[in-house]
Amino acid sequence: MSSEVNSEEILNKLFFSQYKALGLIGEGSFGKCFKGINIKNNEEICFKIEKKSSQKTFLKIESQALENLKGGKGIPDFYLFGYSDNFNILIMELLDKTIENVFEKNNHNFSIKTTCILAIQLVRIKFILYLFYS
């Protein structure tokens, strides 16, 4: 997700009358990912955002994939994909930890069990990418 998205424009702003971004989780080549909240029920959510001007709307593709995979093991719940101001926005379940969090917590070391769990999850991800991008 890309640095084109200015975090200051996003933080504490209300989107779709109920979702507010509270803090940056991370960013990639297409946009940014925020921890947020649904102010109607106080549920913490994940808030992904990219500039509407992006050549491809990766978040729309991701939302379609999440909708198609709904209920699958390890698949976060998908709440909403929409447009607001100059942004494409994906609202989904906030998952507990990132791989980076676990790695740092374990002094930059993974056990054999954790490595095997990650390998299985990576195979799942590869399969999902194969289904949607080939």
Describe each model-derived feature in a short phrase.
Residues 1-16, 22-23:
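Juxta-kinase regulatory segment immediately upstream of eukaryotic protein kinase catalytic domains
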Residues 27, 37-45:
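Conserved N-lobe loop of protein kinases adjacent to the ATP-binding glycine-rich P-loop
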Residues 32:
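Conserved N-lobe ATP-binding subsite of Hanks-type protein kinase domains
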Residues 43, 49-76:
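The N-lobe alphaC helix and its flanking beta3-alphaC-beta4 segment of protein kinase-like domains
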Residues 77-88, 96:
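Short beta-strand micro-motifs within the conserved protein kinase catalytic domain, predominantly
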Residues 95-105:
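Structural motif in protein kinase domains
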Residues 118-119:
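Activation segment signature within eukaryotic-like protein kinase domains
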Residues 124-134:
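Protein kinase catalytic-loop region centered on the HRD/HxD motif
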